[in-house]
Amino acid sequence: MSTMSIDTLIGHVTRICQKNGVAHLLLIGSFATGTARKTSDIDFAVKGCKDILKLEEDLEEIETLRKIDIFDYDSIKNKYLLENIDKCGKQIY
């Protein structure tokens, strides 16, 4: 496993999401708000993903020490979480 740069990691995630037909990819959490630490995981929200389990499996193939969390925006029921994603999320595509 490697300690790749965040930009490189986002590039890998972007390609995998596009391959899986994700309509929109957003960076959320501490990396989106600029509060990430050396040990922070990296969080994404996806919109328009038909098979979230396949996407998660494909993302597990990325060789990184950082944990990657994916949230399916379309299935989130918590309105406060949705508001936070809408307010603080950084759209990748």
Residue ranges and their predicted role:
Residues 1-26, 32-38, 47-93:
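Catalytic core of pol beta-like nucleotidyltransferases
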